[in-house]
Design a protein with these regions (language model features):
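Hydrophobic alpha-helical transmembrane segments
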Residues: 4, 18-22, 323, 348-356
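Hydrophobic alpha-helical transmembrane segments of multi-pass inner-membrane transport and secretion
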Residues: 15-40, 253-288, 311-320, 361-364
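Hydrophobic, regular-secondary-structure patches
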Residues: 26-100, 117-128, 140-141, 223, ...
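Diglycine-centered glycine-rich loop/turn motifs
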Residues: 108-134, 139-140, 145-152
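Basic-flanked hydrophobic alpha-helices used for secretion and membrane insertion
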Residues: 139, 144-239
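Transmembrane alpha-helical interface segments in multi-pass membrane proteins
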Residues: 279, 283, 287-333, 353, ...
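Short cytosolic juxtamembrane segments of multi-pass membrane proteins
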Residues: 372-385
Length: 385
Protein backbone atom coordinates (compact mmCIF):
# COMPACT_ATOMS: atom_id res chain seq x y z
CA UNK A 1 0.00 0.00 0.00
CA UNK A 2 2.97 2.36 0.43
CA UNK A 3 3.14 2.77 -3.36
CA UNK A 4 -0.58 3.39 -3.86
CA UNK A 5 -0.16 7.16 -4.28
CA UNK A 6 2.53 6.53 -6.90
CA UNK A 7 0.32 4.00 -8.71
CA UNK A 8 -2.66 6.38 -8.63
CA UNK A 9 -0.58 9.28 -9.97
CA UNK A 10 0.82 7.15 -12.78
CA UNK A 11 -2.66 5.95 -13.69
CA UNK A 12 -3.92 9.52 -14.17
CA UNK A 13 -0.84 10.78 -16.00
CA UNK A 14 -2.96 11.10 -19.15
CA UNK A 15 -6.45 11.82 -17.81
CA UNK A 16 -8.35 11.80 -21.10
CA UNK A 17 -6.87 8.48 -22.19
CA UNK A 18 -7.52 6.93 -18.80
CA UNK A 19 -11.15 8.10 -18.79
CA UNK A 20 -11.84 6.71 -22.26
CA UNK A 21 -10.16 3.41 -21.37
CA UNK A 22 -12.22 3.19 -18.19
CA UNK A 23 -15.44 3.89 -20.09
CA UNK A 24 -14.61 1.14 -22.60
CA UNK A 25 -14.02 -1.37 -19.80
CA UNK A 26 -17.16 -0.29 -17.93
CA UNK A 27 -19.33 -0.71 -21.03
CA UNK A 28 -17.78 -4.11 -21.82
CA UNK A 29 -18.40 -5.47 -18.32
CA UNK A 30 -21.86 -3.89 -18.20
CA UNK A 31 -22.66 -5.84 -21.37
CA UNK A 32 -21.12 -8.99 -19.87
CA UNK A 33 -23.17 -8.64 -16.68
CA UNK A 34 -26.44 -7.94 -18.48
CA UNK A 35 -26.11 -10.83 -20.95
CA UNK A 36 -24.88 -13.32 -18.36
CA UNK A 37 -27.64 -12.25 -15.98
CA UNK A 38 -30.31 -12.88 -18.63
CA UNK A 39 -28.75 -16.21 -19.62
CA UNK A 40 -28.43 -17.35 -16.00
CA UNK A 41 -32.04 -16.38 -15.22
CA UNK A 42 -33.41 -18.49 -18.07
CA UNK A 43 -31.15 -21.41 -17.11
CA UNK A 44 -32.43 -21.16 -13.55
CA UNK A 45 -36.00 -21.41 -14.82
CA UNK A 46 -35.07 -24.52 -16.81
CA UNK A 47 -33.25 -26.15 -13.88
CA UNK A 48 -36.29 -25.66 -11.66
CA UNK A 49 -38.14 -28.08 -13.93
CA UNK A 50 -38.69 -31.41 -12.17
CA UNK A 51 -37.60 -34.80 -13.48
CA UNK A 52 -40.46 -36.70 -11.83
CA UNK A 53 -43.11 -34.58 -13.55
CA UNK A 54 -44.08 -35.11 -17.19
CA UNK A 55 -45.71 -32.64 -19.56
CA UNK A 56 -47.95 -33.90 -22.36
CA UNK A 57 -48.76 -31.57 -25.25
CA UNK A 58 -49.68 -31.75 -28.91
CA UNK A 59 -46.48 -31.57 -31.05
CA UNK A 60 -48.03 -28.79 -33.14
CA UNK A 61 -49.25 -26.85 -30.11
CA UNK A 62 -52.92 -27.66 -30.77
CA UNK A 63 -55.35 -28.22 -27.87
CA UNK A 64 -55.88 -31.73 -26.52
CA UNK A 65 -59.28 -33.25 -25.61
CA UNK A 66 -60.10 -33.30 -21.91
CA UNK A 67 -61.52 -36.77 -22.60
CA UNK A 68 -57.92 -38.07 -22.74
CA UNK A 69 -57.59 -37.55 -18.99
CA UNK A 70 -58.90 -40.95 -17.91
CA UNK A 71 -56.58 -42.83 -20.28
CA UNK A 72 -53.53 -40.93 -19.04
CA UNK A 73 -54.50 -41.56 -15.40
CA UNK A 74 -54.59 -45.30 -16.13
CA UNK A 75 -50.98 -45.46 -17.40
CA UNK A 76 -48.76 -47.57 -15.15
CA UNK A 77 -46.37 -45.39 -13.14
CA UNK A 78 -48.53 -42.24 -13.22
CA UNK A 79 -49.59 -41.26 -9.69
CA UNK A 80 -51.44 -37.99 -10.32
CA UNK A 81 -52.59 -35.93 -13.32
CA UNK A 82 -53.69 -32.35 -13.67
CA UNK A 83 -54.35 -30.14 -16.67
CA UNK A 84 -54.58 -26.52 -17.66
CA UNK A 85 -55.49 -24.25 -20.52
CA UNK A 86 -53.95 -20.90 -21.39
CA UNK A 87 -54.86 -17.53 -22.78
CA UNK A 88 -53.24 -14.11 -22.81
CA UNK A 89 -55.12 -11.05 -21.67
CA UNK A 90 -54.56 -7.54 -20.42
CA UNK A 91 -55.84 -5.36 -17.62
CA UNK A 92 -56.92 -1.90 -18.82
CA UNK A 93 -54.10 -1.70 -21.40
CA UNK A 94 -51.42 -3.77 -23.12
CA UNK A 95 -48.97 -2.41 -20.55
CA UNK A 96 -50.52 -4.88 -18.10
CA UNK A 97 -50.32 -8.24 -19.85
CA UNK A 98 -51.75 -11.23 -17.96
CA UNK A 99 -50.85 -14.90 -18.42
CA UNK A 100 -54.18 -16.54 -17.56
CA UNK A 101 -54.11 -20.23 -16.61
CA UNK A 102 -57.50 -21.98 -16.34
CA UNK A 103 -56.60 -24.83 -13.99
CA UNK A 104 -57.98 -27.97 -12.40
CA UNK A 105 -58.33 -26.60 -8.83
CA UNK A 106 -58.60 -30.05 -7.26
CA UNK A 107 -55.13 -31.24 -8.31
CA UNK A 108 -53.16 -28.25 -9.58
CA UNK A 109 -51.64 -27.16 -6.27
CA UNK A 110 -50.74 -30.70 -5.21
CA UNK A 111 -49.05 -31.15 -8.59
CA UNK A 112 -47.30 -27.76 -8.39
CA UNK A 113 -46.05 -27.23 -4.81
CA UNK A 114 -43.87 -24.35 -6.00
CA UNK A 115 -47.07 -22.28 -6.03
CA UNK A 116 -47.23 -21.06 -2.45
CA UNK A 117 -50.84 -20.30 -1.52
CA UNK A 118 -52.57 -20.27 1.86
CA UNK A 119 -55.18 -22.90 2.66
CA UNK A 120 -57.77 -20.15 3.07
CA UNK A 121 -57.12 -18.75 -0.40
CA UNK A 122 -57.13 -22.24 -1.88
CA UNK A 123 -60.48 -23.12 -0.30
CA UNK A 124 -62.16 -19.87 -1.37
CA UNK A 125 -60.80 -20.26 -4.90
CA UNK A 126 -62.07 -23.85 -5.07
CA UNK A 127 -65.60 -22.83 -4.10
CA UNK A 128 -65.81 -19.60 -6.12
CA UNK A 129 -66.52 -20.39 -9.74
CA UNK A 130 -65.49 -16.93 -10.97
CA UNK A 131 -62.65 -16.65 -8.47
CA UNK A 132 -59.08 -15.87 -9.39
CA UNK A 133 -55.72 -16.04 -7.67
CA UNK A 134 -52.99 -13.64 -8.77
CA UNK A 135 -49.24 -13.45 -8.26
CA UNK A 136 -48.67 -11.42 -5.10
CA UNK A 137 -46.26 -8.97 -6.74
CA UNK A 138 -48.80 -8.24 -9.50
CA UNK A 139 -51.67 -7.60 -7.07
CA UNK A 140 -49.48 -5.22 -5.07
CA UNK A 141 -48.36 -3.37 -8.20
CA UNK A 142 -51.91 -2.93 -9.49
CA UNK A 143 -53.44 -2.19 -6.09
CA UNK A 144 -55.97 -5.03 -6.17
CA UNK A 145 -57.79 -5.92 -2.95
CA UNK A 146 -59.60 -9.14 -2.04
CA UNK A 147 -63.24 -8.80 -3.09
CA UNK A 148 -62.52 -6.60 -6.12
CA UNK A 149 -64.22 -7.45 -9.42
CA UNK A 150 -61.45 -7.53 -12.03
CA UNK A 151 -62.12 -7.40 -15.80
CA UNK A 152 -59.49 -9.01 -18.03
CA UNK A 153 -59.59 -8.39 -21.77
CA UNK A 154 -58.66 -11.65 -23.54
CA UNK A 155 -56.45 -11.38 -26.61
CA UNK A 156 -57.05 -14.92 -27.85
CA UNK A 157 -60.11 -16.34 -26.02
CA UNK A 158 -63.46 -14.83 -26.96
CA UNK A 159 -66.60 -15.71 -25.01
CA UNK A 160 -69.79 -17.28 -26.35
CA UNK A 161 -71.57 -13.93 -26.13
CA UNK A 162 -69.07 -12.46 -28.59
CA UNK A 163 -67.21 -10.33 -26.07
CA UNK A 164 -63.62 -10.80 -24.91
CA UNK A 165 -63.94 -9.50 -21.35
CA UNK A 166 -63.68 -12.04 -18.54
CA UNK A 167 -64.74 -10.75 -15.13
CA UNK A 168 -63.26 -12.33 -12.00
CA UNK A 169 -63.71 -12.13 -8.25
CA UNK A 170 -60.29 -11.52 -6.72
CA UNK A 171 -60.11 -14.02 -3.85
CA UNK A 172 -56.40 -13.99 -2.96
CA UNK A 173 -52.77 -14.17 -4.00
CA UNK A 174 -50.07 -16.78 -4.39
CA UNK A 175 -46.30 -16.63 -4.79
CA UNK A 176 -43.49 -18.69 -6.33
CA UNK A 177 -40.64 -18.12 -3.83
CA UNK A 178 -36.99 -18.14 -4.89
CA UNK A 179 -37.83 -18.11 -8.58
CA UNK A 180 -37.47 -15.52 -11.37
CA UNK A 181 -41.10 -16.39 -12.17
CA UNK A 182 -42.22 -14.62 -8.97
CA UNK A 183 -42.49 -11.38 -10.96
CA UNK A 184 -44.54 -12.82 -13.82
CA UNK A 185 -48.16 -11.62 -14.22
CA UNK A 186 -49.75 -15.06 -13.74
CA UNK A 187 -53.48 -15.31 -13.03
CA UNK A 188 -55.14 -18.59 -12.02
CA UNK A 189 -58.83 -19.20 -12.79
CA UNK A 190 -61.16 -22.19 -12.58
CA UNK A 191 -61.11 -24.30 -15.73
CA UNK A 192 -64.87 -24.95 -15.55
CA UNK A 193 -65.66 -21.21 -15.66
CA UNK A 194 -63.39 -20.79 -18.67
CA UNK A 195 -64.55 -23.88 -20.58
CA UNK A 196 -68.27 -23.19 -20.27
CA UNK A 197 -67.84 -19.57 -21.25
CA UNK A 198 -65.49 -19.72 -24.23
CA UNK A 199 -66.68 -19.70 -27.83
CA UNK A 200 -64.21 -22.21 -29.32
CA UNK A 201 -62.18 -25.31 -28.36
CA UNK A 202 -64.66 -26.33 -25.67
CA UNK A 203 -63.62 -29.48 -23.82
CA UNK A 204 -59.91 -29.10 -24.57
CA UNK A 205 -56.77 -28.26 -22.60
CA UNK A 206 -53.36 -26.87 -23.48
CA UNK A 207 -51.44 -29.61 -21.67
CA UNK A 208 -51.52 -32.41 -19.14
CA UNK A 209 -49.07 -32.63 -16.27
CA UNK A 210 -48.32 -36.02 -14.71
CA UNK A 211 -46.47 -36.86 -11.53
CA UNK A 212 -44.72 -40.23 -11.79
CA UNK A 213 -43.55 -42.62 -9.10
CA UNK A 214 -40.05 -43.18 -10.50
CA UNK A 215 -38.15 -40.41 -12.30
CA UNK A 216 -35.81 -42.98 -13.88
CA UNK A 217 -38.82 -44.37 -15.79
CA UNK A 218 -39.77 -40.99 -17.26
CA UNK A 219 -38.92 -41.94 -20.85
CA UNK A 220 -40.78 -45.27 -20.64
CA UNK A 221 -43.90 -43.74 -19.08
CA UNK A 222 -43.80 -40.87 -21.57
CA UNK A 223 -43.69 -43.31 -24.47
CA UNK A 224 -46.61 -45.25 -22.98
CA UNK A 225 -48.70 -42.08 -22.89
CA UNK A 226 -47.77 -41.09 -26.44
CA UNK A 227 -48.51 -44.60 -27.75
CA UNK A 228 -52.09 -44.27 -26.51
CA UNK A 229 -52.73 -41.52 -29.04
CA UNK A 230 -50.27 -42.46 -31.80
CA UNK A 231 -53.04 -43.27 -34.28
CA UNK A 232 -55.50 -40.57 -33.22
CA UNK A 233 -55.88 -37.09 -34.70
CA UNK A 234 -54.74 -35.72 -31.33
CA UNK A 235 -51.17 -37.04 -31.15
CA UNK A 236 -49.12 -36.16 -28.09
CA UNK A 237 -45.52 -35.54 -27.15
CA UNK A 238 -44.56 -36.23 -23.55
CA UNK A 239 -41.30 -35.16 -21.87
CA UNK A 240 -40.10 -34.17 -18.42
CA UNK A 241 -40.95 -30.75 -17.08
CA UNK A 242 -37.28 -29.75 -17.33
CA UNK A 243 -37.01 -30.93 -20.94
CA UNK A 244 -40.20 -29.06 -21.77
CA UNK A 245 -38.78 -25.85 -20.31
CA UNK A 246 -35.57 -26.40 -22.28
CA UNK A 247 -37.58 -26.86 -25.47
CA UNK A 248 -39.40 -23.58 -24.89
CA UNK A 249 -36.09 -21.81 -24.28
CA UNK A 250 -34.65 -23.31 -27.48
CA UNK A 251 -37.40 -21.57 -29.43
CA UNK A 252 -35.61 -18.30 -28.68
CA UNK A 253 -32.52 -19.64 -30.44
CA UNK A 254 -29.14 -20.76 -29.12
CA UNK A 255 -28.96 -18.28 -26.25
CA UNK A 256 -25.64 -19.66 -24.97
CA UNK A 257 -23.94 -19.20 -28.34
CA UNK A 258 -25.44 -15.72 -28.73
CA UNK A 259 -24.17 -14.59 -25.32
CA UNK A 260 -20.75 -16.23 -25.67
CA UNK A 261 -20.19 -14.78 -29.16
CA UNK A 262 -20.99 -11.22 -28.08
CA UNK A 263 -18.94 -11.47 -24.89
CA UNK A 264 -15.97 -13.02 -26.74
CA UNK A 265 -16.01 -10.26 -29.37
CA UNK A 266 -16.25 -7.57 -26.69
CA UNK A 267 -13.36 -9.00 -24.66
CA UNK A 268 -11.13 -9.56 -27.70
CA UNK A 269 -11.60 -5.91 -28.65
CA UNK A 270 -11.07 -4.83 -25.04
CA UNK A 271 -7.86 -6.89 -24.76
CA UNK A 272 -6.46 -5.22 -27.88
CA UNK A 273 -7.48 -1.76 -26.68
CA UNK A 274 -6.14 -2.17 -23.15
CA UNK A 275 -2.89 -3.79 -24.28
CA UNK A 276 -2.24 -0.99 -26.79
CA UNK A 277 -3.03 1.69 -24.20
CA UNK A 278 -0.72 0.18 -21.57
CA UNK A 279 2.12 -0.26 -24.06
CA UNK A 280 1.75 3.35 -25.19
CA UNK A 281 1.82 4.50 -21.57
CA UNK A 282 5.00 2.45 -21.02
CA UNK A 283 6.79 4.07 -23.98
CA UNK A 284 5.92 7.54 -22.72
CA UNK A 285 7.43 6.73 -19.30
CA UNK A 286 10.66 4.99 -20.30
CA UNK A 287 12.88 7.84 -19.03
CA UNK A 288 10.73 8.09 -15.89
CA UNK A 289 11.29 4.39 -15.15
CA UNK A 290 15.03 4.83 -15.71
CA UNK A 291 15.14 7.67 -13.17
CA UNK A 292 13.18 5.56 -10.67
CA UNK A 293 15.68 2.72 -11.07
CA UNK A 294 18.53 5.19 -10.61
CA UNK A 295 17.20 6.39 -7.25
CA UNK A 296 16.78 2.87 -5.91
CA UNK A 297 13.62 1.21 -7.27
CA UNK A 298 14.34 -2.43 -8.13
CA UNK A 299 13.48 -4.02 -11.47
CA UNK A 300 10.83 -6.16 -9.76
CA UNK A 301 9.25 -3.14 -8.08
CA UNK A 302 8.96 -1.31 -11.41
CA UNK A 303 7.23 -4.29 -13.05
CA UNK A 304 4.87 -4.68 -10.08
CA UNK A 305 3.95 -0.99 -10.31
CA UNK A 306 3.07 -1.39 -14.01
CA UNK A 307 0.95 -4.47 -13.26
CA UNK A 308 -0.72 -2.75 -10.31
CA UNK A 309 -1.75 0.21 -12.45
CA UNK A 310 -3.30 -2.16 -14.99
CA UNK A 311 -5.15 -4.17 -12.32
CA UNK A 312 -6.44 -1.02 -10.60
CA UNK A 313 -7.66 0.42 -13.90
CA UNK A 314 -9.25 -2.79 -15.17
CA UNK A 315 -10.63 -4.19 -11.93
CA UNK A 316 -12.02 -0.85 -10.75
CA UNK A 317 -13.74 -0.18 -14.08
CA UNK A 318 -15.02 -3.76 -14.32
CA UNK A 319 -16.56 -3.57 -10.84
CA UNK A 320 -18.35 -0.35 -11.79
CA UNK A 321 -19.77 -2.02 -14.93
CA UNK A 322 -20.83 -5.15 -13.05
CA UNK A 323 -22.45 -3.20 -10.22
CA UNK A 324 -24.38 -1.08 -12.72
CA UNK A 325 -25.58 -4.32 -14.36
CA UNK A 326 -26.55 -5.71 -10.96
CA UNK A 327 -28.60 -2.59 -10.24
CA UNK A 328 -30.20 -2.40 -13.69
CA UNK A 329 -31.24 -6.04 -14.14
CA UNK A 330 -33.89 -6.19 -11.37
CA UNK A 331 -35.33 -2.85 -12.53
CA UNK A 332 -35.49 -4.01 -16.15
CA UNK A 333 -36.91 -7.38 -15.10
CA UNK A 334 -39.58 -5.69 -13.00
CA UNK A 335 -40.54 -3.42 -15.91
CA UNK A 336 -40.67 -6.34 -18.37
CA UNK A 337 -42.53 -8.67 -15.98
CA UNK A 338 -45.80 -6.95 -16.86
CA UNK A 339 -45.28 -8.31 -20.39
CA UNK A 340 -44.93 -11.86 -19.11
CA UNK A 341 -41.13 -12.10 -18.88
CA UNK A 342 -39.42 -13.50 -15.76
CA UNK A 343 -37.58 -11.35 -13.24
CA UNK A 344 -33.88 -10.76 -13.89
CA UNK A 345 -30.92 -10.72 -11.52
CA UNK A 346 -27.12 -10.91 -11.54
CA UNK A 347 -26.09 -13.93 -9.42
CA UNK A 348 -23.02 -13.68 -7.22
CA UNK A 349 -21.24 -16.36 -9.25
CA UNK A 350 -21.47 -14.19 -12.39
CA UNK A 351 -20.09 -11.25 -10.41
CA UNK A 352 -17.19 -13.44 -9.28
CA UNK A 353 -16.48 -14.67 -12.81
CA UNK A 354 -16.52 -11.05 -14.01
CA UNK A 355 -13.94 -10.06 -11.40
CA UNK A 356 -11.79 -13.01 -12.44
CA UNK A 357 -12.02 -11.97 -16.09
CA UNK A 358 -11.01 -8.42 -15.12
CA UNK A 359 -7.88 -9.60 -13.30
CA UNK A 360 -6.99 -11.95 -16.18
CA UNK A 361 -7.52 -9.15 -18.69
CA UNK A 362 -5.25 -6.85 -16.69
CA UNK A 363 -2.48 -9.44 -16.42
CA UNK A 364 -2.57 -10.49 -20.08
CA UNK A 365 -2.60 -6.91 -21.37
CA UNK A 366 -0.01 -5.56 -18.91
CA UNK A 367 2.57 -8.38 -18.81
CA UNK A 368 4.39 -7.28 -22.01
CA UNK A 369 4.76 -3.72 -20.71
CA UNK A 370 5.74 -4.95 -17.22
CA UNK A 371 8.46 -7.26 -18.61
CA UNK A 372 9.90 -4.47 -20.74
CA UNK A 373 9.94 -2.14 -17.75
CA UNK A 374 11.70 -4.79 -15.63
CA UNK A 375 14.39 -5.41 -18.28
CA UNK A 376 14.87 -1.74 -19.08
CA UNK A 377 18.51 -0.60 -19.12
CA UNK A 378 19.07 2.70 -17.30
CA UNK A 379 21.79 3.85 -19.71
CA UNK A 380 19.76 3.04 -22.84
CA UNK A 381 16.61 4.58 -21.42
CA UNK A 382 18.26 7.87 -20.45
CA UNK A 383 19.89 8.07 -23.86
CA UNK A 384 16.52 7.85 -25.61
CA UNK A 385 14.90 11.02 -26.96
Amino acid sequence: MKYFRLIWTGLWRKKVRTIFTMLSIIVAFLLFGMLQGIDTTFKQLVNQGRLNVLVTQNPAGLPLPLADLSQIQAVHGVTRVTYRALFIGDYQSLRNIMIVLPIDPDNFFAENPQFSVSQRNRDVFLHTRTGMLVMKSVAERLGWKVGDRIPIQALNARKKDGTATWTFDFVGTFDIPNSPASEQPILLMNYDYFDTGRATDTGTVQLYQETIADASQAATIGNSIDNLFANSPNRTHTETERASAQSQLAQLGDLDFFVEAIVAAAFATLLLLTGTTLMQAYRERIREFAVMKTIGFTDRTISVLVLSEAILLTLGSALVGLLIARALLPAIGSALSRYGLPGLELPGIVLGVGVGFAVLLALVSAVPAALRAERLSIVDALAMR
